[in-house]
Amino acid sequence: MIIVFMTVFLLGSLGGGNSSNSTTSICSTSNVLCSGTSLTYNSSNASTQAATTEFQNLNYSSAASSQNPLEVINAHKAYGYGLTGSGETIAILDAGFSTSHDELDSKTITQYGTQTAATGVNATADHGLIVSSVAAGEDDGTGMQGVAPGVSLHWASYNQRNGNTYYPTHWANATDNASSAVVQNNSWGIDYQIDTLQSDINSNSWTNAYGIAQKFHSSGYTANETSANAYITALDNFQDHGVVVYALSNTSSYTDADFQAALPVLFSQLEEAWITAVNVEITGSSGNETYTRKSAPCGSTGKYCLGADGYQIVGAGYDRSATNLYWQGVSGTSFVAPQISGAVALLAEAFPNHNPEQLTDRLLASADNTFFSHDAAVTFGNGVKHGYDDEFGHGILDIYAALQPITSS
């Protein structure tokens, strides 16, 4: 295994708006949270997996007390049920891909349009490859592994237009093409707060679609209102079969979510199966943790926001003469989002009759929200209430809890 040491903060979005002490209702289509998986749990298998070098290698924090991100989200306990994400597909809209790395070389990968290839120049140039390895790195006894090592992947590059005049047209087409995916991972975005964009829209009497098109266009992504609407429609249609996961900004000084992660604020039809990702470094011994936000807060997206530890981790890197290069010390919400996407794939395998909204509900309603005070709560369709706040959303992803019957917290 070739190791390259590097710390880099990568794409994401913002967060922070104020919430009152209230209850928000999100209606699930049935009372599916009342029961857990019917699969048999093998604690020995879970413990064995957690002890492997490959499982431990995702973590690379300089903090001596840093916890393993995979163990924090109880990924090993999902493996105790025999879950790997087999039969599921994660769509990744990103840039900097390579199929030759050891972590992905045995995986089924569908590619849409022209890809921006990984170059190995730095971790940013290999961004899509790193994200893919965190979500889906193979459990093959070497290197590291991802959350859902058995999944297939669908790749598309957000910084290509694939012959279209406007970028959002390509994003819409790529989203539509991922029709077999159970989740779409978005570890990219433009740093511009949703509340600021809302102010721009109101002061200029723009439509919401025109407003986001203006921001895309001014940020170098050629767009118009029609193409922006096409992208929103594609994201809405995707939720018929999959969950949309969006990384928040890495700008920790932000006071609200960035507009891309917070698109459901402008387009309420997107709220059905949408999760935003906040980066939380977790240190200390089990039961005595310290939680430090390393990104923008959840803000206006708090009621559909989840956290995980994406601080100083390991991910696959590109090298033209080797297939086992790994970047060490990469950080960002970009690497929280694929942990959530991997969790969606594991749950889809465990609950094959769940629709995307139900998978989303299960993850949000089971997150660990015990380490902060709640500003409000979401009431799910079966009466389960789960508290959240503007900083951490619903709290830390817990895959094991999501596999169990869920009660209010």
Question: Which residue ranges define each predicted feature?
Answer:
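Substrate-binding/access-modulating region of protease and related hydrolase catalytic domains
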Residues: G17, N21, S28, T84, ...
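Short, small-residue-rich loop/turn micro-motifs
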Residues: T108, A148-V151, W188-I190, A308-G310, ...
